[in-house]
Amino acid sequence: MNERPQSLDPELLIGPVKPPGTRETRLMGIAALTGAATSKGTSSGLGNDTDFALLNALRIWSDAVLVGAETARKENYFGVRTTAQQREARRGRGQAEVPPIVVVTKSLKFDTATQLFTDTRTPPLFAVPEDVLGDTEVSEHAREIEQAGGVIVPVEGEDVSAVVAALHARGLARIVCEGGPSLNTQLIGASEVDVFHYTVSPRAVQPSELRLFGEADTPSDHAFILEAAHTTSDSMLFLRYRSVREG
């Protein structure tokens, strides 16, 4: 039996990449053997150093980091961390120095004193259906967010494909989604995921309070092919699937 490495190069896990400016959406998720997507309340409790390195590498690859509102709140999101070398490399590729966190929300109800606003090099974006911006309460939240440095991104409609289209319209071609379950489910259901990075943690976590995917409103069945599978010495399994699209 071959000895497994303690860690893996995240670039190996990312695999082939298309030229900057080419539209591609990647989904990253981790789950225990029982299907649980969190341990002690956060997904970070399931991962190892390689999983964390993959998350950071996908952020550096991306033009936008997409996350659901509840996940951003629960996991106390902050801006993407980059080194001077990474920022220079991104400039050389024609990308912004730092990709923004993009929060998908319908309420715009956020505490602007949190590190999502205070600990970031680039303003967070908030993708919100444009038809709710006329609501008095939502409009007030939008004003508070903008005063705190955030950017409101009106979306034509409430489906996730409209969110992706709105980001593409802003020149944000490379998108990585970090959850949560509702957003993951919507992206998969709408066939918006091109590459799925799925990490399996060798732990049996009970109860499964939060899973990687939630209940879908509309049935869907989309095929993926396995591009790569790698393991580390602690039995963490890193899978990379690519969507099979007809035509």
PLM-predicted stretches and their roles:
Residues 1-247:
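Enzymes that bind and transform nitrogen-containing heteroaromatic metabolites
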